[in-house]
């Protein structure tokens, strides 16, 4: 005679259904989030989407947004950086002013300090394409060193040595990274 515990079998079935439901829910959420916040389609379509997002999220002029969007996407793809993260970094660094120059000598859209990056970023840093490409290179380099995008963005602001050296500099870098992430979130909502 075999004894079957129906309450035990019901519990197993209930757990299996709950697990399936949870997995399906997570898939639906992930798909809907990526559909809302990512660039898709052909290169021209992604450039147009990003241009529209820059105009709506950051009030970038249509001419500037249309000119810079393809450069941002090309540089982001070349260095395996999210185009929305690179666009948010530009918003934070220069507010899309290609002639920007900081008191410390940082130049252009991504505010590159030429003395630090001269070897790996040759060319005129006031040239928008050169500058965006260099910013993507720097961010990618820091990501490989830091292991996370948040830390890479903090490094972009204070450098890896500054980040490691003191609590206050690390705090400044983390605050900067939160600001860039906020700009990225704003852009993704506008896409």
Residue spans for each PLM region:
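Substrate-binding/active-site groove segments that recognize
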Residues: 103-120, 135
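Short, low-complexity, Pro/Ser/Thr/Gly-rich segments in the mature regions of secreted, periplasmic
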Residues: 170-190
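Export/targeting segments at the very N-terminus of extracytoplasmic proteins
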Residues: 37-91
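Substrate-binding/catalytic groove segments of enzymes
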Residues: 118-119, 142-152, 162-165, 188-190
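Short, functionally critical alpha-helical segments immediately adjacent to catalytic or ligand/cofactor-binding
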Residues: 70-73, 77-97, 112, 132-136, ...
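Sec-dependent bacterial lipoprotein signal peptides
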Residues: 2-36
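Acidic helix/loop microenvironments that form the catalytic cleft of cell-wall polysaccharide enzymes
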Residues: 94, 148-173
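A short, structured beta-strand-centered segment in the mid-to-C-terminal lobe
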Residues: 122-131
